Each structure stands twice: as structure tokens, then as C-alpha cells.
């Protein structure tokens, strides 16, 4: 097992690669100018390289600063806390920020090797089979249901009466069979529940992690093909900003289950869409439209924390599992609809009603629940990264205010897969006091300046007052051309107020 190099500089990746070489070949000689060269004898002595001929792996826990290796006899040895801290501080100071003395000629390493609990060839057929069978099972349900209806319609009256009598005689057996099926379904459901280590909530998982990771890799290839001409280069300041935020969030939350297990890779797409998403395999996609919509790094940190929370919590696999379960139950109801409805037109109408009921009663409410959970965990990730969490609700207030200014129609929340902007802002406002306490626990510096939420409300109030006075001024001029002009109050632009708060 090797290191996974993620959002690291080329020099730090070279050092980690050197530590891996040290583990495999027992020797690694860094350049003379590397500040880490004088510390390697202590590493060799602690790991016993003079007596042990081979080791299997070297592990670096970034925030805990422990360098460990697994020996051939399956035992592990770690540097002491003081030695690990010294090595970690040197690694961070001299390599993360671009010191070239350790590796002047090495390019950045994006990914070395992925972890697998099963061979990729064994993992491939299952998710691909699910994708293929999903439309097939719906077609099969329609064919079976329609066939049952045609069979029943073709039966003569005497055979229909005979069949009804048989059902009445065996009703208890049928009831017992249905009860057994229901019991098996309940057992299947509860045996596929898993408890999230982050939230403690039980969730249904029907898709294995490796199988779903393969699906994520396939989805990643599709997105990369679509965005191949719109990706910003790694030298672009916007890319570097997003990379810095993602790296800071993940490094400050290494103790959160799942964060350290994912190799986070950043992609910035040149697009006016206000959007960002993270695939379950750690591929982060951020659109420049979102970068233009946020006011400062605090808002961007919260939004990326929200997307990272989706990946860490496994929401994609959870939603896919729910969809598979509902598809199975829907197949039963679909068969019944096509069997009971006397005409195909009525069956099509019944199928449409069934799909809409499933969408608006299960799919969309569940999606809104997952979004709210990602908001909560994303706010906690941002708080542990010492972000001004008060800016989180301001972003959604800005989005709501912008939509109202543009006159966009306000749809009911139950029609959407996401909570409304106003409800999200209110929900975050209720969570912010707890997030501020978490910042204090993490020894973050105290927040300075006024509350950005108050600044935003005052700014909006001034904008609305000035707008009303301008409208009143125009109306008075039309009615009384000779009237004295009304003195216009000084307008406080939105960008100025928010920029002033950011500078503070």
C-alpha cells in the first residue's frame, strides 16, 4: 500500500515518495540542501532499518503528525510525538510552500495508486448490470402486467368464476405468502442499514463502496469529456484559490471519518453557472460562475465544505440505494397498474401518476433532507477550518435577494430538490451559534468586525429606501414640474458594504 498524493506541492510529493522508497529499499538520500536530510538518521534508527530487511508501508497522518511503518512481522513502529512533530513541521514549512531544495526537477504528482478492497475486474459487472437492468425491469413490469390483463380478458365467464372461487378457498395461503414476502422485505431492509460515523444516522446502503466508486470513476470520465475544453489551467489564480480552500478544509478535518480516505482533486470549469459538486471519489468541480457569486473566501469555504460533506457522508450512494428500493417497489405497483386498468391509455395515466407521487413524496423530500444534512456538516467543517461561519447564511440571503431583484418566480419548496434560499439561511442561522462554539474549541482566532449578517441587512435596507425615494422623486417631478428637487440620500452599494466587512 502506497501513499496517495492529493493536493500537495511537487516538493512535498517528492519527499513523501522518498519516504516510500525508504520503506521499500531501506535507503533514501535526499539532496544535501534539503532541510530534512539531517533528520533521516533518527528515522532510520527508530524504524530499525539496520536490522529489519523489509517493510510493507509507510503512513503519514498529516494533522496528528505521526510517521508510522508496518514491519515484516506485522508489527507497527511509529516515531515519537516529538520526532513526528519535528518531521511534520519541517515537511510543511520547507516543502508545501515551494522550497525547491528537496526536489528541483520533480513535477507535481497527482495520483500514485488507488486503494482497492477487491479487484477492479470483480467490481465492474455489478454496477454496470444495474445501469442496464433499470430500464429493462420497468419494461418487464409493463409486459407482465399487460399480459395478465389480456389473459384475464380472454378468459370465458365460467373460468373467471372458477378462478375467483379458488382464490376465496386459498385466501389464507395467499395471505400467508404475502406476509412472508413482507417479512423478508423488512429483514432485507434492516440488514442493509448502516450507521454513519459522522452523524450517527442509520441509512440504507444497497451498493457496495467499491462498486459505487467504480460508477463514480465512470461519471468522472463523462464530466471530464464534457468539460475538457473549459477547464482552467493549474496556474490560473482562480484554480489556485479553490485548491487552497479545499486543501485547508481537508487538512483541518483529518479527524472526520472519510476525509483522509479520499484523494481530493480540484477542477475549475469556466462556465457562468453558479454551481459546484464533488464526486464520491473526491473529484471537485467548481464553476467560475460560483466564484463570481461569492463575496469572500468565507462563503466559498462554506460552499465547498457543503460539497465535501456530501462526499464524506456518502449521500450519492445513499440516494442511489433509495432509488433502487423505490424502483423495486415501483415495479410491483407498475405491474398492478397495467394489470388492473382496462385500457392502455388508463394504464399510461396511472403510470404517470405513480411516477409523480414517487418523485414528490419520496425523491425530492429525501433530497432536501440530504441537502440540509450537508449544510450542517459543511458548516462544522468550515468552523473547524476557522472560517467565519456567519457568512454562510449571508450567501443564501444574497441569492434570495438577487432572484427577487431579477423578478424570478418563487416556486414552492416541495417542487424542488433543494431547500429554498430563505429556508436555508434561517436553518444556518440556527446552527451558527453551535458552529461558533466549535471554532472556540478548535482554538480559532476570535472574529473581528461587525456581524456580516447585520451588514447585509442594513445594506439591503438602504438600497430599498433609496430605491423607494428615487421612485417617489420621479413621481413628484411628473406631478409638479416646478417643485424643488428632493435631496437624494447617499447610497451604500452592496459590494462596498460586503467588501468593507471582508477587509475587516
Curated annotation (Swiss-Prot):
Gene3D superfamilies the UniProt entry points to: Metalloproteases ('zincins'), catalytic domain
Membrane topology note: Single-pass membrane protein
Transmembrane feature ranges: 175-195
Transit peptide: 1-41
Membrane topology, Mitochondrial matrix segments: 123-174
Description of post-translational modifications: Autocatalytically cleaved in response to mitochondrial depolarization both at the N-terminus and C-terminus to generate the short active form (S-OMA1). Autocatalytic processing at the C-terminus takes place at residues 426-435. The S-OMA1 form is unstable. OMA1 pre-processing by AFG3L2 may participate in maturation before OMA1 autocatalytic cleavage. Degraded by YMEL1 in response to membrane depolarization. Protein turnover is regulated by prohibitin (PHB and PHB2), which promotes degradation of OMA1 in a cardiolipin-binding manner. May form a redox-dependent disulfide bond. Exists in a semi-oxidized state and is activated by prolonged hypoxia.
Molecular function GO labels: lipid binding; metal ion binding; metalloendopeptidase activity
Function noted in UniProt: Metalloprotease that is part of the quality control system in the inner membrane of mitochondria. Activated in response to various mitochondrial stress, leading to the proteolytic cleavage of target proteins, such as OPA1, UQCC3 and DELE1. Involved in the fusion of the mitochondrial inner membranes by mediating cleavage of OPA1 at S1 position, generating the soluble OPA1 (S-OPA1), which cooperates with the membrane form (L-OPA1) to coordinate the fusion of mitochondrial inner membranes.
Stress-sensor region: annotated segments: 144-174
Record gene name: Oma1
Protein's UniProt name: Metalloendopeptidase OMA1, mitochondrial
Protein species of origin: Rattus norvegicus (Rat)
Subunit structure: Homooligomer.
